[in-house]
Regions:
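Non-transmembrane, aqueous-exposed alpha-helical and coiled segments at domain scale
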Residues: 1-145
Length: 145
């Protein structure tokens, strides 16, 4: 249900096939692994504006596997079937973030959510996009400098 709402808000459908993309809350466990394996030095968060007006937001911070909480992903496909996400919940915001180009102008709850994402992933934010226009971007760390 949440994934479908996010998909509709963000118009997440294949450009060629029109097939719906899988959407859901950010998986910090997977993100931390991607950061470690790939040497990622900065995150680019896109479509922040589609979260406007949501009463609350979640981040998966661990998995529950056979009753035990783990911050590591299972190594096999069967393990995934037996995992439950453990979520950290954040308050949403009602203010629009669409088109904002300065960090300080984001709603406080949006900044708190993004800072938590940064802290939990262990990777700094580089860019936050706040809409479909190229100019609807907050550059925190220029990845091309």
């Amino acid at each position: 249900e949440t994934g479908e709402d996010i998909r509709k808000r963000g118009q997440e459908f294949g450009a060629t096939t029109g097939r719906p993309r899988r959407c859901g809350w950010i998986d910090i466990v997977a993100l931390k692994r991607a950061v470690a394996i790939n040497g990622i030095s900065g995150l680019c968060i896109t479509k922040l504006d589609i979260l406007d007006g949501m009463p609350s937001l979640k981040m998966c911070i661990a998995y529950k596997y056979h009753g035990k909480q783990s911050e590591y992903a299972p190594l096999d496909a069967q393990g995934w079937d037996q995992c439950e996400p453990v979520y950290l919940e954040f308050p949403g915001w009602n203010e629009s973030t669409a088109g904002i180009t300065e960090w300080e102008k984001l709603p406080p709850a949006a900044r708190a959510y993004l800072r938590a994402l940064e802290e939990l992933s262990g990777c700094p934010l580089a860019i936050v996009s706040t809409g479909p226009d190229r100019d609807a971007t907050i550059i925190l760390q220029d990845p091309f400098a």
